[in-house]
C-alpha cells in the first residue's frame, strides 16, 4: 500500500431544501388553506477515525466531498427528506487543520472518534408556516439555507508505542523486519526507506507497535530530506530506539548529529525516553566494536546496547528495554492528579 501522510481536501455540506407553496384542493372545499411542507435539512460532512487504515492515500485520488442537498417540501404538509451525510474515513493519528495549515480543528487519536466538519443547511419553511390571523393564504415560502464549505488539510502522525530513529542505512528497517511481520524494503544503500512504516512486536507474551521512519540527515528539523515530516511520525511514541551504525566512521559523532536534529525539532521529542543501541555489531571485529562502543558511550552518557539484527544478538534485550519504558510511560499517565488545595 502506498503511503501518504498529508492531503488537502474540499468539503461542502448540503443545502437545505426549499419550502413548498401549496394549497389544499378538495371537492366541496373552496378555501382549503395553505399546506406547503418544509424542505429537508442538508447533509453534514463528518470525519471518522476507523480501523485498518495507516495512510491517507485515498485522498490523493479524490479531493472533493459534498453531502447531499435536502429535498424540497411538498403539498399536503409533506416535509422534504433530509440530505444524506458524507463521512471521510481516516486512520488514527490524523489531525485536521484549516486551509491556512496552522489552525488545528481536530486531532483524532482513537478509533471511533467522529467530528462534524460542516453542518448542513436548514430546510426552508413552506407557506403553511407563514399562516397568521391576518394572512390566511400566504403565497411565499423560504428557500433552503446554504451549506458550509471549506478547504482543510489532513495530516497523519502515526500512533506507535516506540519509534526507530537514526541516520540512513543505520539498520532500522532490518531491525523492524527482524522483530515484526512488516516487510520493509532493505538494501545496502542510504534512503532505502522512503516512507514511515509500522509493525507489531510480540515479545515475552506482550505486544507493542513499532514505527520506522526514513533516515535523518543534517538539517532534518528544517525540512532537509523531508526530515521534519518524518520526525512528526514519532512525536506520539512513548520511547525512541536510537540506532547508531557500528560501521560508521565515528559512532559518537553519528549519535550527536541525530540527537541534535531531534533537539532542534522540538515538540517534546527530545524529552522522550531514549534507548541507544549500536547496530551491525556482527560486521565489526572485537577491537573496532570496543572502540565504537566507547565512543558512543561518551557521546550518549550511558552504555549502549549492542545489536545485530542479522544474528539477533541483543535484540531480545532491546525489546525488553522498550517494553519497560512503554509500561513506565503508561503507568505515569494512569496516575491520578492530586486535587489542588489552597
UniProtKB/Swiss-Prot annotation:
CDD domains: Obg (cd01898). This is GTPase Obg. GO terms for biological process: ribosome biogenesis. Keywords: Cytoplasm, GTP-binding, Hydrolase, Magnesium, Metal-binding, Nucleotide-binding. One of its GO terms (cellular component) is cytoplasm. Residues 1-159 form the Obg domain. An essential GTPase which binds GTP, GDP and possibly (p)ppGpp with moderate affinity, with high nucleotide exchange rates and a fairly low GTP hydrolysis rate. Plays a role in control of the cell cycle, stress response, ribosome biogenesis and in those bacteria that undergo differentiation, in morphogenesis control. It comes from Methylobacterium radiotolerans (strain ATCC 27329 / DSM 1819 / JCM 2831 / NBRC 15690 / NCIMB 10815 / 0-1). GTP binds at residues 166-173, 191-195, 212-215, 279-282, 308-310. InterPro entries: G_OBG, GTP-bd, GTP-bd_Obg/CgtA, GTP1-OBG_CS, GTP1_OBG_dom, GTP1_OBG_dom_sf, OBG_GTPase, P-loop_NTPase. It comes from the Bacteria. One of its GO terms (molecular function) is GTP binding. SUPFAM superfamilies: Obg GTP-binding protein N-terminal domain, P-loop containing nucleoside triphosphate hydrolases. Mg(2+) binds at residues 173, 193. Monomer. The keyword Magnesium applies. Its cofactor is Mg(2+). Residues 160-327 form the OBG-type G domain. Its main location: cytoplasm. It is found in: Cytoplasm. Its EC number is 3.6.5.-. Belongs to the TRAFAC class OBG-HflX-like GTPase superfamily. OBG GTPase family.
